[in-house]
Amino acid sequence: MKEIDKYAGKNILVLGLGRSGFAVSKLLLKLGARLTLNDKADLAADPKAKQLADLGVRVIGGSHPVDLFDQEKFDYLVKNPGIPYENPMVAKASEKGVPIITEPEVALSASESPYVCVTGSNGKTTTVMLTQQIMDHYLQKQGHHAHAVGNIGCPISEVVLNQAGPDDLLVVEMSSFQLMGVTDIEPKVAAIVDIYNNVHLDYHKTFDNYVDAKLNVGRFQKASDYFLANFDQKDILAREEKATKAKILTFSENDPVADFYIGQDYLMHGEEKMMKIADIKLPGIHNLQNSLVAIGISSLMGAGKDDIAAVLSTFTGAEHRLQYVTTLDGVKVYNDSKSTNIEAATVAIQSFKQPEVLLAGGLDRGFVFDSLVDLFKKHVKAIVTYGETRYLLADAARKAGIKTIVVVDNLHEGVKAASKLAEAGDVLLFSPACASWDQFKTFEERGEYFVKYVKELEEK
């Protein structure tokens, strides 16, 4: 941890006692701040709340007391990224002119390790995992490590406080929720894997707001830093060029004009062959793009082709992201629970040459699924739909001419139905194309239940 004066003696309100709220509170205490922690949940029996209280934090649970802002002056409000800006405490802080920031900004300002940041609508977690493993392979030769932190599930504050040294590297996954609250971060390399519409518009309200939040990943970089941009998304690229002072390098699915691109047999950096495509374990063109971005970041940070090959030739996928689960009677089963939108489902469905039995459905966020019709025609032999969107997805399947359509209420029924439809040589793909919140708390929980239900079938 780097000693900084920015938060020393400051009166700070931390909003939300999740894992990141707990971690950033401990970090801020170490940096000399005076803390109040507030959560709408009852914290009377919460062990984390008790631990913070024992360390001198004023803990207020069970409500959002907006009158706190009338009683005293706060220097900062550090909010859980998932809490909307319409929250009464956040709105009151804004009204009072209190700077509103999130955990990543606090943690990265105190990091003595250099860091790189990755964001995007789809693919950022896989890209972060690949980058972390490549860089760890490289740094271990020197006795140091790369740490995957941020939206991937490990708060940056935890690693900054307890693990990372000056010669380590933080590989940070950042969501648009986290980036919206950022006012000053400077990654050595920033990357935006892709940006699609219809993602988190319930939070950001407009697509422009969503893009602006994503652009914060490179907005505060210097000319000596690097920014990796998607050459194939020209409208976004034009905005990226205006948003960052860093040197922009591009990557492309197939255009050799880009700095990094997918060639016929190799992932390329200019004329240099970086990795043989046939040796990459991850399925799908989108994972070749994720691999390309990881190669770009890692090579800029010093890793060599031996480090890249060691990881890409063995890495089989992140949990819930086209995760291979098992083979049931000749049917390969994949868990793509992270597919919370149409774009993510599209890349998953396109990833296989075998006939697919698709299991999809979830929360109805107003998506129109007609864009999947042509994809269904080419790849899907049968479909099982469940959840709030079950009839909407079934309607898209009918338009595609799919003859076998099964509509069920929940995921458990869906797994059983899909397994009966799949034959040896098929792929059973769980790629919901929807958020999980109609029946599950998170996409991770949904994916865990999918795997559990599949394993139950395997044991019969």
Curated annotation (Swiss-Prot):
E.C. numbers: 6.3.2.9
GO MF terms, alphabetically ordered: ATP binding; UDP-N-acetylmuramoylalanine-D-glutamate ligase activity
Catalytic activity line of the entry: UDP-N-acetyl-alpha-D-muramoyl-L-alanine + D-glutamate + ATP = UDP-N-acetyl-alpha-D-muramoyl-L-alanyl-D-glutamate + ADP + phosphate + H(+)
Domain of life: Bacteria
SUPFAM superfamilies: MurCD N-terminal domain, MurD-like peptide ligases, catalytic domain, MurD-like peptide ligases, peptide-binding domain
Keywords carried by this UniProt record: ATP-binding, Cell cycle, Cell division, Cell shape, Cell wall biogenesis/degradation, Cytoplasm, Ligase, Nucleotide-binding, Peptidoglycan synthesis
Binding positions for ATP per the UniProt entry: G120, S121, N122, G123, K124, T125, T126
One GO term of the biological process aspect: regulation of cell shape
Pfam families registered for this protein in UniProt: Mur_ligase_C, Mur_ligase_M, MurD-like_N
Claim: 4Fe-4S is one of the keywords in the record: no
Pathway where this protein functions: Cell wall biogenesis; peptidoglycan biosynthesis
GO cellular component: cytoplasm
Compartments it resides in: Cytoplasm
Record flagged with keyword Nucleotide-binding: yes
Cited InterPro entries: Mur-like_cat_sf, Mur_ligase_C, Mur_ligase_C_dom_sf, Mur_ligase_cen, MurD
Role noted for this protein: Cell wall formation. Catalyzes the addition of glutamate to the nucleotide precursor UDP-N-acetylmuramoyl-L-alanine (UMA).
Family: Belongs to the MurCDEF family.
Name of the featured protein: UDP-N-acetylmuramoylalanine--D-glutamate ligase
